[in-house]
């Protein structure tokens, strides 16, 4: 459950940061800010994608270890 809670917490933090990026984007009018916003959004999406992949990998390893199909044989 700790891993699940951590994933939910980080996902919430990322979604709130993207939301605040939207606020800043509408606050300032200019191409420079739009470019920064686009780059920020892309890097955030890459982070989310990487985190989801890592989360599912850890989840799969955990399930494998519990059922003894995969993972470390200790």
Curated annotation (Swiss-Prot):
GO terms for cellular component: membrane. It comes from the Archaea. Keywords: Membrane, Transmembrane, Transmembrane helix. The chain crosses the membrane at residues 52-72. Its main location: membrane. It is a single-pass membrane protein. It is found in: Membrane. This is Uncharacterized protein MJ1386. It comes from Methanocaldococcus jannaschii (strain ATCC 43067 / DSM 2661 / JAL-1 / JCM 10045 / NBRC 100440) (Methanococcus jannaschii).
